[in-house]
């Protein structure tokens, strides 16, 4: 069972606070604000097919200070390994002038929504550069 309230401080640029069905990513620094803005922008401008691979963005606070998303159940390391072995992660199609894959295939970057759909919960990799 998923706890109603959790705080995840493992991220180097953001802290994630989960409460009920929501997840709030709070920026620790300028890079965290850039990552929040990147995810909000990508969610807003991408295609429906790509959006189905991404955890939904509900709101972005000014300057990227915070990003409100739908909460997803984190993947376990075992589930992640199974998805890698089965080549079951969704395919992100390259569309110029995009930056390429916005996520990595690691457990901490993926989760499942309440409907069971596999989504990237951290898709700001290009903003880290």
Tell where the protein language model's regions lie, with residue ranges:
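Catalytic activation segment of kinase domains across protein kinase-like and atypical kinase folds
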Residues: 100-129
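Conserved structural core of kinase catalytic domains
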Residues: 28, 45-90
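Active-site Asp-x-Gly
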Residues: 34, 80-82, 124-129
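ATP-binding glycine-rich loop module of kinase domains
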Residues: 2-48, 62-67
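Protein kinase catalytic-loop region centered on the HRD/HxD motif
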Residues: 93-100
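Short small/polar-residue motifs
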Residues: 13, 51-58, 104-108
């Amino acid at each position: 069972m998923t706890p109603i309230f959790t705080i995840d401080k493992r991220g180097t640029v953001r802290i994630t606070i989960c409460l009920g069905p929501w997840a709030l990513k709070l920026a620790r620094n300028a890079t965290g604000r850039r990552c929040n803005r990147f995810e909000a922008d990508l969610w807003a401008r991408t295609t429906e097919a790509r959006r189905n691979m991404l955890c939904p963005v509900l709101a972005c606070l000014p300057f990227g200070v915070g990003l409100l998303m739908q909460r997803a159940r984190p993947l376990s390391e075992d589930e992640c390994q199974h998805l890698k072995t089965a080549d079951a992660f969704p395919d992100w199609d390259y569309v110029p002038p995009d930056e390429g894959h916005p996520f990595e295939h690691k457990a901490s970057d993926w989760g499942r929504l309440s409907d069971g759909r596999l989504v990237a919960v951290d898709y700001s990799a290009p903003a880290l550069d």
